[in-house]
From Swiss-Prot:
One of its GO terms (cellular component) is ribonuclease H2 complex. It catalyses: Endonucleolytic cleavage to 5'-phosphomonoester. Its EC number is 3.1.26.4. Residues 27-216 form the RNase H type-2 domain. This is Ribonuclease HII. It comes from Geobacter sulfurreducens (strain ATCC 51573 / DSM 12127 / PCA). Its main location: cytoplasm. InterPro entries: RNase_HII, RNase_HII/HIII, RNase_HII/HIII_dom, RNaseH-like_sf, RNaseH_sf. It is an enzyme of class 3 (hydrolase). Belongs to the RNase HII family. Its cofactor is Mn(2+); Mg(2+). It is found in: Cytoplasm. The gene is rnhB. GO terms for biological process: DNA replication, removal of RNA primer; mismatch repair.
Length: 217
């Protein structure tokens, strides 16, 4: 079963959606979100988080609203508080092969399947349900509305940022640690100068125009 709220307006991340699911009899509720749909390089990372119901987690909100330092602090807090955390990764090759939407859903599915405590209900950021036979609700801008989704957004974002910092060491000159693969001016200039790296998404505009120019092996 999938229910989509198309007209939801953002508000501070709270327990409202989890409470509604609990009143309907669901007991193991996971929030799902991703990071990295838009970049020109690197993977898309999804996270699934099950929190102890009603736990006070001050500051947990949409990861995009938080500073990197605050995200790191909350990442540690969530890791120490959550009942279960699952992470899924779809790399640049998967993205190029099946497209970014399908890669995102595959990463979300992997994140849910990695949970040590199988959920009976999913709260999913966005409008596309996770391809699993689990009751779920998709919520536009859910990372600002559901604390479970907000927690997942932080786990996904910090995990991906750390992966991109590692790639920065493997492929110097592109600035991956700074822009995380997004199409900043400095990133576009690096692609023009160096050609695509081995982790660039070759089907994305801004990269495919430079195929065959790579100086990185």
């Amino acid at each position: 079963m999938s229910l989509t709220l198309f007209d939801h307006e953002p508000q501070p991340a709270v327990w409202d959606f989890e409470s509604r699911a609990a009143r309907r009899g669901y007991r193991t509720i996971a929030g799902i979100d991703e990071a990295g749909r838009g970049p020109l390089a690197g993977p898309v990372v999804a996270a699934a988080v099950i929190l102890p119901f009603g736990t006070d987690l001050p500051g947990v909100d949409d990861s995009k609203k938080l500073t990197p330092a605050r995200r790191d602090d909350l990442f540690t807090l969530i890791q120490g508080t959550a009942l279960a955390i699952g992470v899924g990764v779809a790399d640049h090759k998967v993205i190029d092969r099946i497209n970014i939407l399908q890669a995102t859903l595959a990463a979300m599915r992997e994140a849910v399947e990695c949970l040590t405590d199988p959920p009976d209900y999913l709260l999913v950021d966005g409008i596309s349900p996770v391809p699993l036979p689990v009751a779920q609700q998709t919520i536009k801008k859910g990372d600002s509305a559901s604390i479970s989704i907000a927690a997942a957004s932080i786990i996904a974002k910090v995990t991906r940022d750390r992966l991109m910092a590692e790639y920065d060491q493997l492929y110097p000159g592109y600035g991956f640690a700074e822009h995380k693969g997004y199409g900043s001016a400095s990133h576009m200039a690096a692609i023009a100068a160096l050609g695509p790296s081995p982790i660039h998404r070759t089907t994305f505009r801004g990269v495919r125009e430079h195929l065959g120019e790579s100086r990185c092996r």
